[in-house]
Amino acid sequence: MINKSLGTFILGSLIILDAFVWGLIFLQPKTISPEIHFLDVGQGDSTLLLLPSKVKILTDAGPDGKVISSLEKSMPFYSPYIDLGIISHPQRDHYNGFNYLLNHYRFGAFLVNGRDAPAPGAEWASLLETIEKRGIPIIVIGEGARLRYDDTVMSIVSPIKE
């Protein structure tokens, strides 16, 4: 039989935890315009776009796992989901960080330009295999493609169609 003070402690703890969770949900800052975060990944590129509707788009992920610590500074810890990963071109310093991110984050889809990696290696093959195994759609896009979400429109200007 649980004594009265232990029951009171458990109930009080649950109420505090509930208030904390709802505080995280309702007190987070409201984004009224898109935010762009240029992530420090060392050699390479990575850019996070946060849309007002909470959509997260990550373009490139650098050459290694450094992207994880940069991303953790720009995204809420309780949101391990990225709506769209974009690989601008298949060079290691742009795509390989996704190999690390896929162990920590879930992705809704990936956009690629459809061109082959200049020297495809095990890392590129591993990335494509992991994406496929997880059932994440890979969408091939090129010049002239337009992505629309709510009031946000992104136009693809490269690579030029062959």
Predicted regions and their residues:
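Non-globular, low-confidence helical/coil segments that flank catalytic cores
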Residues: 2-162
